[in-house]
Amino acid sequence: TSPFPGGGVSPFPAVPQAPPLVPEPLPAPPLVPQFTPESAPPLAAVPGAGPASLEEIVRIAHDKGHSDVHLGIGEEPRYRARGEMVRTGWPVTDAATFSRWLREIMSPAEIDSFQRDKEYDGSHAFSFVRVRINLLDSLRGQAMVLRLIPQKIASLEELNLPVVLQELASRPKGLILVTGPTGSGKSTTLAAMIDWINSNMARHILTIEDPVEFVHESRQSLVRHREVGQHTKVFHNALRAALREDPDVILIGEIRDQETLATAIEASQTGHLVFGTLHTNSAVKTIERILGMYPAAEQEAIRRSVSESLLGVVAQGLLKTSDGKRCAYHDILINTDACKDYILRGDLESIEEIMGRSGFDGMQTANQALQKLVEDGRCSADDALAQSLKPNELAQALRGRT
């Protein structure tokens, strides 16, 4: 029945029904490039975007075969690829992003140490690669350099290193120096020599590093790594203590001062095989450097100690090859009886002459190594001459072969 009197219709005019409200579609979110190692271009990323995490940045470097990552506040991220600095095309890094990256690889205490000292050396292990960390402060702001350290240690054979390096590694005691400029692959060569001992000899190998770089799993040998700052407070304390820890082989990293050298020589003279590095470009320059750590009044004593303890010096450099890659070349001194006599007398010029004509002892000069690379077609003469410490001598040798 009608709700109105008399059953009539409503006296009010009908109100038209409003159409139902249909919400307008929301605009699609802007597309943000998703970075993966596979999608990242080799030299530059999509302008205006970049990987979100430090791990992604390092993974791209790892998968592309780059050696270093350079990051800094107010700077465009860059890689080092085959010796050359490479731009990424990503935006400059702001302070908040840089701080977030630090928290990915450092503890609060380590960050506080960097903020206090303005410098920091350390290491971090991702699931796919290990990195050596160096932090610095600069005019533009804080910055970091990450050196990628492969988890798999290349063998002496895989690196095509001279056979004499295996012979040196097999010696029971003495001092072996692997030298070269920064980025020349000293750590890789040392790791290969330690790996050979670990694979073939029953030894106790102790490394004292700042920081630990290549990590060796114990095989035939027992390997223990100690990192300055984490496992020992002071490098020299750890090195001195090592003599009481029953090692057969001691890797001490860089010989930076007289105290380190003295302990290394003492260890090598008391039945240990000791490996160390210096930033020198040739075998003879290495001898000059270590003798130069001592004053004139102590020269006779240090020359005698070095002549008795030194097994050999391997000075390494890296050279760009014809296929765009890089290979190592070596200046190798084996401390034969003749070399010992020259070291005792301080006649270092004669040592290089012996190196050039003692290939049967495993010795060679850097120029001989460079000449062979040119003759084998692995590099150009111009690139070899650019690396040579004695380019006129090398040029004459190259002319003599044509």
Predicted regions and their residues:
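Short, flexible helix-loop junctions that flank or precede catalytic/ligand sites
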Residues: 4-5, 11-13, 19-402
